[in-house]
Amino acid sequence: MEITEIKVKKRDKIGKQFAKKYRRSNLIPGVVYGAHLKENIHILVEKKDLWSLIKKGHAKEQHLLRLIIENGENTITENAILQDLQIDPIKDEFLHVDFHAITLEELVDVYVPILLVGEAKGIKQGGILQHGVEEILIRALPLDVPPHIEVDITDLEIGESITVGDLKFPENIKVLTPLDEVVVGIIPPKGYTEEVTTGEAQTESQT
């Protein structure tokens, strides 16, 4: 897992009224939590730094972060992953961010997004791509977590699908998503189904 460093500031004032003031100053309120922490750490993140994380794919892919938490003259460093980023759906503005603090020796359960690669044979034949699960839950050490999981659909034909169980993972990654979950499939268009049915009917009438 790639490591990205980001500086944040510890905040003492908590509540909606303070959160609004912070956001007007381009500071996004957030929290850092983790099993090894004595208590949650309430923080402020520069709006531009969050945009930078998004541009690097952190909102869609898994990356390890090194949080530099400034508290006056004191500084705390925590390894973390971006757990949740709340965005106002109307104004398209950041509201709050959650970071999950972890140790590098600690197994973590994380959702890793799926990246489809290649052009399926079934699509060239007129089939329709049907998405299943868009991310897979895995358990691994932080440095072993991939940013995404590539699924090659090149040989996928009409009527075929790929399940989680069809994917290959290294031994240091445990898959927690049910293996029978469908990742992607190619379904036939209506015309294709009718043609097959008509052909079968003609064969049956000749026997």
Swiss-Prot record:
One of its GO terms (biological process) is translation. Pfam families: Ribosomal_L25p, Ribosomal_TL5_C. One of its GO terms (cellular component) is cytosolic large ribosomal subunit. Keywords: Ribonucleoprotein, Ribosomal protein, RNA-binding, rRNA-binding. It comes from the Bacteria. Belongs to the bacterial ribosomal protein bL25 family. CTC subfamily. HAMAP family: Ribosomal_bL25_CTC. This is Large ribosomal subunit protein bL25.
